[in-house]
């Protein structure tokens, strides 16, 4: 299973430089940062900025914009994606529902995320870029299933699943049995969609073996940066070492 390293665009360390020619290190960056900068090299803007010759994904930064109260328009994200055109995968603008959202507010976020995917997909189609939709997990699975079906009916090349972290980690305000239900939802998406499935934010070594068993294609993590700051590395299958 593929594991992408989430990274700020100007941060260090950059492990892909250390493993150059030895190991492919796919990375994920956020449009939340890219919206503030301009390409340095229009021939390969992202690869030049990151000093990376391998695979790069771009997340829309929807959660970051939402958590900071910033309203980002679809046209603005389309501009960023067009300027930084050399990534292999681009995720749609999403509005993750919180476990504490009531069903009305949660469904409004699902509706907006779907509308954004449709609009952004049409805009980027002109640039030859295919956008990946995101379906979020939420405690009211009736709502989730309706929007999952709507996304599958649009026949995307890949689906990303978000909103799982609070349910997998069983934080406050999530229903009893949430971890099992969230993992069952991942399995349902894999089975019903039948295509490539990426799970957002669950690249912990203790979780990735489970995702692989469920048939997930890829996931991502930013935890490696926190551990690296303390001189640690993450070990496949769980655990860490100095």
Regions inferred by a protein language model and the residue ranges of each:
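Non-catalytic, usually N-terminal nucleic-acid engagement modules in DNA/RNA processing proteins
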Residues: 1-127
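Glycine/Thr-rich beta-alpha phosphate-binding loop at enzyme active sites
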Residues: 101-108, 130-198, 204-209, 213-216, ...
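Residues at the C-termini of beta-strands that transition into short coil/loop
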Residues: 94, 222-223
